Design a protein with these regions (language model features):
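Short alpha-helical segment of the dimerization/phosphotransfer core of two-component systems
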Residues: 33-38
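Helix-loop junction within the histidine kinase core
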Residues: 49-60
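Conserved catalytic submotifs in the C-terminal HATPase_c
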Residues: 59-64, 81, 86-96
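Short helix-loop "hinge" at the ATP-lid/N-box region of the Bergerat-fold HATPase_c
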Residues: 116-117
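Short conserved segment of the HATPase_c
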Residues: 150-162
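Short alpha-helical Gxxx[C/S/T] motif in the catalytic ATP-binding
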Residues: 175, 179
Length: 217
């Protein structure tokens, strides 16, 4: 309801009063942003439904994981720099190629990075980490920040639809739920916990071996 309110209220002001071009532009820019956010939320809900109904397929192919993780993280360097947050990498060199859908997993990793950016302060560090399991059959991709941590949230509900936690910086409550759905369809796992000392860790795990590469229901 919040995005709709932020769209309808300024539109009503535009309709009810004569405004010059500059005033109209100031009102229309946030309207566009909220409309775009609503479109993104609707797209995520529809994509989850398609996955659940088997109408959307994952395009799973082997990719060099560490190289991919760094390429996704590098897209956020400017945003972290503007906020005064360091972005670092701890990549397990044992990990080579891993089968996954690049586009779907990029959404998941980007969502975790946006959360770190949102809840971290200037002067802190966010770290992208890859880890190979002891059995060498799973890899874990983690985002560790030095933000406010997870004391204000129910970690059991964190990846549930529309859950927003007990903090003031709420979102749509869809992103993490969508991320979980994408990783579950990879036959993987997602999770989150408080980091040692300060901050939070969000992670997802992918199996190193799948029945087939290419398309996986």
């Amino acid at each position: 309801r919040t995005p709709l309110t932020l769209i309808c209220a300024p539109l009503k002001r535009i309709i009810n009063q004569e405004s010059d071009k500059q005033d109209v532009e100031k009102l229309l820019v946030p309207i566009y942003k909220q409309a775009y956010q609503m479109k993104s939320i609707i797209d995520m809900v529809l994509d989850v439904r398609k996955l659940e109904e088997g109408k959307d397929m994952l395009h799973i192919l082997p990719h060099p994981l560490n190289e991919w993780v760094r390429s996704v993280g590098d897209k956020f360097i400017n945003e972290f720099h503007v906020k005064g947050i360091r972005l670092e990498y701890e990549l397990d060199e044992q990990i080579k190629e891993v089968p996954f859908d690049q586009n779907k997993c990029e959404f998941v990793l980007s969502n975790f990075l946006m959360n770190a950016l949102k809840f971290s302060e200037s002067g802190t560090t966010t770290t992208l980490i890859t880890t190979l399991s002891q059995e060498k059959d799973w890899v874990r991709i983690s985002v560790r920040d030095e933000g406010m941590g997870l004391n204000m949230v129910d970690t059991d509900s964190l990846f549930s639809s529309f859950y927003q936690g007990g903090h003031e910086k709420g979102g749509s409550g869809i992103g993490l739920s969508y991320a979980k759905s994408l990783i579950t369809h990879h036959k993987g796992r997602v999770g989150a916990s408080n980091a040692a000392g300060k901050g939070a860790i969000f992670y997802f795990e992918l199996p190193l071996f799948t029945d087939t590469c290419g398309q996986l229901e």
